[in-house]
Amino acid sequence: MSGSETRKATVGGDQFDVYTGNANPELARNICRYLNIDLGRADVFEFANENIFVRIIDNAREKDVFLIQPTSRPVNQSIMELLIMIDAFKRASAGRITAVVPYYGYGRSDKKDQPRVPITARLIADMLTVAGANRLLTVDLHQGQIQGFFNIPVDELTAVHLLSGHFLQKRIENLVVVTDLGFAKRARTFAELMDAPLAIVEKRRIGNQDRTEVLNVIGDVRGKRAIIVDDEIDTAGTLIQIVNALQREGVTEMYACATHAVLSQGAVERIDESLLREVVVTDSIPTSAEKRGHKIKVISLAPLIAEAIVRIHRGQSVGALLTSEVHFTQEMLLWDVDSPPDRTPGEGDDGRPAATGGLVPTPRAIDVSGR
């Protein structure tokens, strides 16, 4: 996108602005649409020599700035865009800069599991901090300990309430939730929300390639319907291995969900040709209609991230968004992108600035699947 489609963003008397790079402008627009605000104006583009240029059009002095930019494909360009945007806002005297990174690229490179290899997830954290970010807002990191790589505050949201809410509407009976050890903690929350038992798939990674081997299924799955839960779907090779293993164990019907739809080459075809009934992902990474195939459904993180932005700006707790205590996480599933609420920007039902948990009268999740 040459010159990001951006406009000034404020809520009532609150002085905070939301801007976007080119990684996922549609998510940024949906966040602002949920908040009933305009998107901040900035030009973010690439010269013919592949140098990235950022020019902020609005006055950012002393503003609380939120930059929406998942570090997804093209990963390295998205990272550089974000770093340059942060630098531009720092030099424009922004009061605080929050990098909103729904998908954290290089998240798998979080440890030295072989000799003479980098910890790139830590390097990216250092780069964001040195560039001038004051805070990070992200969703379902590959490993939670990545938060410890930062010397600035990190708020990690989770999509498990949105994803489980989708399946709760289906009223699937005789259900088991299946995951691997790496996502077991979040999957436990998902299983509790679904009121279903949890089964674990034991697997191991082979070499440096995106290849894994499924070794065993731990738990009673025979004769049940299964939802496979993970943080991301990349090549879908591991997902299909799990599907095949569950079929051998006697599972009768299978679904899958993940926060991040990386969907590398061949993934959609593998999913379409599999025994999976449906695969549900979020829009942390843009997923065009042609990349969804016949079985992939996309629900939006926009309401969740929007609520977190307002809470961060107002100094309120973000932790409440990680629990089932916040009722709007279920109501979000009904938010229709084609008929957003008619609301004066930043006002609640009584005409005052909206409080978190009720920014619009019936906050509902945006379904960007096109279905």
Where are the regions that the model predicts?
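PRPP-associated nucleotide enzymes
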Residues: M1-R371
